[in-house]
Design a protein with these regions (language model features):
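Start-of-domain marker
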Residues: 17-84, 95-97
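Second-shell loop/turn segments in exported
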Residues: 28-35, 123-131, 243
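Flexible, glycine-rich surface segments
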Residues: 156-246, 250
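A cross-kingdom marker for long, charged
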Residues: 24, 211-297
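Bacterial N-terminal signal peptides
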Residues: 1-10
């Protein structure tokens, strides 16, 4: 992923751009509006995010992080160019030595509100932010890049994640929801603030232990990879939940890892290992008990 890992990939020209973004806009709830503004929004955002260099790192073209924004427009006011939306943001990471991709991040933003006029040019820097739209897009770019880098080296995304935190602090003055400190336990502030909290360091370490030592290893040695994942769930996920029980990050993570975890353990591993994993997952997220039952089978 980062420069040190490029040597294992096929030799080709390195590209600066890190993201491959799809920005899907569902405007069915605002029927009667001119659809061209929604098409232009999609095209403008995708071009801006995909052409921008977010870090100094060099990425191979086939290493760019796939990110999808599924945006639902709830209300649109043409007179003020105001969009009220929800967005489901998902990022995927390739698993090395396999054709499998794994979900790196998946979460809903219920305050994805912004102003955009057709043919607007997007401008941004970390200090002035530019606009609510570019601030949100940059927030998710930095967050996802930080998660990705954490998955390739222990705490490897610290610098990028700090940029995300600084952006969030600067966005406190924006007159839009989702940024305010301690207003909501799963808004944009809460996600990055919790992730960088010292008490959540085990959760950050989990990213490396789960992906690099676990999933990436499974293609070579499934038994060793799964054992490493079991250890990561104990020392990373469980410990983070114990150290900061009010953080929703472990629960959000288990929500989007539900099916993957069930598949990793279903019919595999010792019963003792499976019971230990089940107890961790059920203790954090009992609402997914149906999936956790598969872990024990």
């Amino acid at each position: 992923m980062v420069v040190a890992l490029l040597t294992v990939m096929p030799v080709e020209t390195a590209h600066a751009q890190e993201l491959q973004v799809k920005f899907n806009v569902n405007s069915k709830q605002v029927e009667g509006s001119d659809k061209s503004v929604f098409d232009n929004l999609k095209e403008t955002v995708e071009q801006w995010m995909n052409d921008r260099q977010w870090t100094e790192l060099q990425f191979q073209k086939n290493e760019r992080i796939a990110v999808t924004f599924n945006v639902t427009v709830v209300k649109y006011d043409k007179a003020t160019n105001m969009f009220e939306c929800t967005a489901l943001i998902q990022a995927n990471r390739p698993v090395y030595n396999s054709a499998y991709t794994t979900t790196l991040y998946n979460n809903k933003d219920d305050n994805f509100n912004f102003q955009f006029a057709q043919f607007d040019q997007l401008n941004f820097d970390d200090e002035t932010l530019g606009s609510q739209l570019t601030a949100m897009l940059a927030y998710y770019a930095y967050l996802i890049l930080g998660l990705d880098l954490d998955s390739f080296a222990p705490l490897g995304g610290t610098e990028v994640l700090q940029r995300c935190m600084n952006l969030t602090n600067n966005a406190q003055s924006l007159d839009f929801g989702g940024w305010k400190a301690f207003e909501d336990s799963r808004n944009r502030f809460a996600i990055i603030n919790d992730y960088l909290d010292e008490a959540m360091k085990p959760f950050r370490q989990l990213q490396y232990d789960y992906y690099r030592l676990g999933l990436d290893e499974m293609a070579n040695n499934a038994e060793r990879g799964r054992t490493n994942i079991s250890t990561a769930l104990e020392t990373g996920l469980k410990k983070a939940h114990e150290d900061k029980p009010l953080s929703l990050l472990p629960m959000i993570w288990t929500d989007y890892k539900r099916d993957e975890l069930a598949n990793i353990y279903k019919g595999k591993g010792t019963q003792k290992e499976k019971e230990a994993v089940y107890n961790i997952l059920f203790g954090i997220n009992a609402s997914q008990s149906e999936a956790w039952d598969k872990v024990r089978n």
